[in-house]
Amino acid sequence: MKNYPWLKIDTASIMFSSLSSPDWGRTFHMSAYFDKEINPDILRKACEDLKPYYPSMFSYLKRGFFWNYMALTDKMPEICSEDEKCLCPIVMKKDRTPDFRLTYSENRVTMDCSHSLGDGMGAGRFAEALITRYNELMNGEDGKYVSTQNPEENTVNAFAEHYKKDGEVAPDVTTKAFHFDEKYENQNLKLIFVELPVDEIKKKAKEKGLSVTEYYVSVLIQGMLKTDKKAADDLIVIGVPVNLRSFFKTKSVRNFTIQSYVSFSPEGRSDYSLDEIFETVRGQLRKQLTAEDVQKTVNKYGSLVNNPVLRIVPNVIKLPVLKKKQRGTHECMSSIFTNVGVCTLPEELARSVRSVELVNGDASRYGLGVTTSAISYNGKLSVCFSHTNNNTVWCENCVEILKSLGFSVNTHTRERKGTVSVGAKEKEAVCADRLKAYFNI
């Protein structure tokens, strides 16, 4: 490369990337099941067509002198069979490939995406565009690809754009929450997908005056109480990421979510009925998500990168502090439930895509052995339990609770295959832009 295009890391990625290493990275996974076997050559062509419109997706994480940053690349992502790499994390590497990977197996295609690139809603837009273009090519469309997407709008750091320098800042959450006694098994990731009809859970949630998220979180809480007796003596907290695109106008595919929390204090009891848990859970999220409180949280994120003292501290000193802060943030959560809502695909694409899945991924470096995620498509709610070991009792208890409530429940599993590996190191350009990136100027 004769030049060195780069982007300042988005505000949330400062924290996400602090724990990234050559053997681990915070990674989520999105899958689509087509009605035909995946063609990897056409998948690559679809990816090439999208590249000019989503520049931030074609970047990789780098350590700078003061801050991490994202180096844009002219290379394509790794595209391989699931037999080689299935659900493996995106790690720090020196081969200049983008921080996402595409894998395929029979009729399933999966995007493994580093959280440094974006969140589930932002990167999900790219994933939807990718499978849309793939489907067009599979159906014989071979003309020049033109998109209405604006690459500049897609790469905006929305946190920085909506940060108010003199605005009030939300306080840090310091409460310690119940955690399972987890044994992390090296490079293990076992997924259990729990599927149930969307209409059924919507109806039952409405009867109780709850959202679908509140209803399912209540099931998760009761499942914890049934799984571990120690949960009754601690505060149970489920972290629920909130998409800020419904509060602020932005088209960015980069990170723009904040954490909200659902708390339940058992006070020594483990025999709570679901109705009792509903009473406590109802309305908690709504109270946290006023426009005023959301702005305070955005200001809190922005105050980190705009702290005049922190800005001049070298990264080698700053990173251990950020790592500790990131782990501390997750000490206040028992687990995470990410619900991206309903996936609505274009009509022609929907005829070819049978189902979709969202996987929160491995959060063991945060101290969370099991995370959960959900997406609705084609009348089904698909909830994934991501385990970093083989202890699946919590998930099994939640399934039994759902069945006892009369839900039609189906389950299936997936497991990580292959190992983390990266390509050979490639030289980067030596130029003024690279120095600017390294020193974040």
Task: State what each model feature region is.
Residues 1-11, 105-108, 117-125, 129-203, ...:
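Non-catalytic, low-complexity flexible loops and terminal extensions
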Residues 55-64, 138-158, 203-219, 324-340:
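Short, charge-rich amphipathic segments
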Residues 61-71, 99, 104-108, 143-149:
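Short, glycine/charge-rich beta-strand/loop segments that flank catalytic centers
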